[in-house]
Structures are given as C-alpha cells and as structure tokens.
Design a protein with these regions (language model features):
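Sec-dependent, cleavable N-terminal signal peptides
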Residues: 1-18
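Blade-edge motifs of beta-propeller repeat domains
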Residues: 18-31, 63-82, 114-134, 166-183, ...
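Short coil/loop residues immediately preceding or within conserved phosphate-binding loops
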Residues: 33, 56, 84, 136, ...
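Beta-propeller blade termini
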Residues: 34-41, 85-94, 137-144, 186-195, ...
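Glycine-aliphatic tripeptides that mark coil-to-beta-strand junctions in extracellular
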Residues: 45-47, 96-98, 148-150, 197-199, ...
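Hydrophobic beta-strand segments that make up the repeating blades of beta-propeller
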Residues: 49-53, 100-104, 152-156, 201-205, ...
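A short loop-to-beta-strand structural motif that recurs across blades of beta-propeller domains
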Residues: 58-62, 109-113, 161-165, 210-214, ...
Length: 317
C-alpha cells in the first residue's frame, strides 16, 4: 500500500510538472511572420507583443487589451528594417521604457527603435545602427562580462558564427568570437542555463538541426564551452529559455521550421543539466520564432510563435 501511494505521489508530481497548451491565433496577416517577442511596451501592466514580418520589411507592436482572455490590436508598423529576422524589447537608453532592438539580415544591421515614453507610445522610426556589417539573423542583449553595461550577442547566419559584441562603455562595441564553426545559426538567447551565476548563450543552428549551449566560465573576459542540448530539431530556427513548469530551473523552447514544430526541452535541474523533449505543436507552418511570457496574467507561461508560411503570430495558452 505504501509503495502504491508513493507511485501515485510521483505520478501526480510528474503530471503537475507537465503543462498542456491550447493554440489560438493572435494575427494571421503578416507577410512572412519572422519574429515574435513580448513585453509591457506601453507601461500599462499587461504584456504586449512585438512582431516582425520579413516579407513586408516591417516591425509591429500589438497592444494587449488587458482582459483575462486578451485580444491584441496592431498599433503601428515600422518599415526601415530590410529583412527583419529578430526583435528584442530592451530599455537601451535607460530612460525607463522599453525600446525595440532588431536584426535585419538583408542590410546586415542591428537597429533600435526608441520608445518615446507616451501612454500610447511611438517608436522613433529614425533608427540608428548599433552594429553594422554583420550577417544578423538573431540577437540578444545582456551583461555578458558582468561589467555593468549591456553587450550584444549575434547569430551570424550564413557566415556560420556566434559572436558577442562587448560594450566598451562609450557607445562602441568590439566583436569577440564565441563559435566560428556554428552551422547556419539563426537565433541566440542569453540566460544562466545551469544556475551558476553567469550568463550562458543558447543558439539554434539550422543546417545541423542543433540547439547548442555555450557555457560561460564566468570570468570578466569570459570563454565558452559548447554543449549540445539536442541535434534533432530539423531546421532549427529559434531558441528561447524560461522556467516553463515552475520547478525552479531553466527549460528551453525551440522552433523546428522543417517540421512545423515547437519543442520544449525540460531541464532535470542538475548542476550539469540534461533535457527531455516534448512537442508542443506540429502545426506551426514554417515556424521562424518562438517566445514565452504570461500573456493572460494567470500565473503560468504561455508560448508564442511566428510562422512564415501562414503569416501567423500564434499563442499557445
């Protein structure tokens, strides 16, 4: 009897740790939806969406109405990006509101659209370049070397590199190689994967179907050791990480374009973690991007995707 109770307890805990998701469309009219992210862009307490459509060379922000079952309204489109592939919300000018940082692969630029801070914000369409001349397919921002300023990490697409650009503290950046043999990296994400107090790098490498983890050694001039999370994500286009099951460790989401799938790789929480794969959906038609945030403010993580073949931004609740 005690053994039976123990088994039931273990099964109950396992089931509680395995969230399920219900799919719905947020928008379905973006010309080749290529990127999605989410944050409170207007400071009203709910989570809005930023999206890019490569076919229209545009970046959009979609306002959340704040309801328990939210709907989203496209508020603006900004058209100076040539082939936008990644969008990141970040307060780049440290004025208390979130700006939009984007990577565009046709003109090889990383740009910023600056938030004017209004209740119904506009994002300055007179963009300025952060880094030029990069084969920018993916980017993220964070303090990689823990020196108090914001650095940039870039996925170099057809140039097969992952680099970080060290902020020199004077609005200039110096390139540092992380991996010059990455096989067509399309996405990067910064997070402390192993909870050791430093910032690691994740990448999605499309040509070898790999989700890679570059583990930082935590130094002031960090070096990185490459590890493989999974090498069966066919056409790996995007990677994101968060605690999806609220168990205190970092899980990983990945987009497999050639499979139309979103994968969730659940961490086992170890100091040197391993990951177990679960398929969230196999119906994201030509998926380019995946992201996670609590869109409906119900206390759990929701998933968003951008899929180019059906022009959709979708939400998995």
């Amino acid at each position: 009897m005690r053994n039976s109770l123990a088994i039931l307890t273990l099964l109950s805990g396992f089931l509680l740790a395995q969230p399920s998701f219900t799919a719905s469309d947020i928008v379905s009219n973006l010309a080749g939806a290529s990127a999605v992210s989410a944050a409170d862009m207007d400071g009203d307490g709910d989570i809005d969406i930023i999206a890019a459509d490569e076919g229209g060379d545009a970046i959009h922000w979609l306002e959340n109405d704040g309801n328990a079952n939210p709907t989203f309204t496209i508020r603006a489109a900004y058209g100076n990006s040539d082939g936008p592939w990644a969008v990141v919300p970040y307060d780049i000018d440290l004025d208390g509101d979130l700006d939009i940082i984007s990577a565009s692969h046709v003109d090889n630029k990383i740009r910023v659209n600056v938030n004017n801070g209004a209740a119904d914000p506009d994002f300055d369409d007179t963009v300025y370049d952060v880094v030029s001349g990069v084969d920018a397919r993916g980017l993220d921002l964070g303090d990689i070397d823990n020196d108090g300023d914001i650095d940039v990490v870039v996925a170099g697409g057809g140039s097969n590199y992952v680099k970080w650009y060290e902020n020199n503290g004077s609005q200039s950046f110096s390139a540092v190689n992380i991996d010059v043999g990455a096989n067509n990296p399309r996405s990067v994400f910064l997070i402390d994967v192993d909870s050791d107090g430093d910032i690691d790098v994740l990448s999605a490498n499309a040509s070898d179907n790999e989700i890679a983890w570059y583990e930082s050694n935590g130094a002031s001039d960090p070096t990185f050791v490459q590890r493989t999370i999974n090498n069966s994500v066919t056409g790996a286009m995007s990677v994101y990480a968060a605690d999806m099951d609220n168990d205190g460790d970092i899980d990983i989401l990945a987009a497999a374009q050639e499979e139309d799938k979103i994968y969730w790789f659940e961490s086992d929480g170890a100091a040197d973690p391993s990951f177990s794969a679960t398929t969230i959906t196999s119906s994201a038609d030509g998926i380019y991007s995946v992201y996670a945030k609590d869109l409906d403010n119900d206390g759990d993580m929701d998933i968003m995707s951008a899929s180019a073949n059906d022009d959709k931004i979708a939400w998995y609740e």
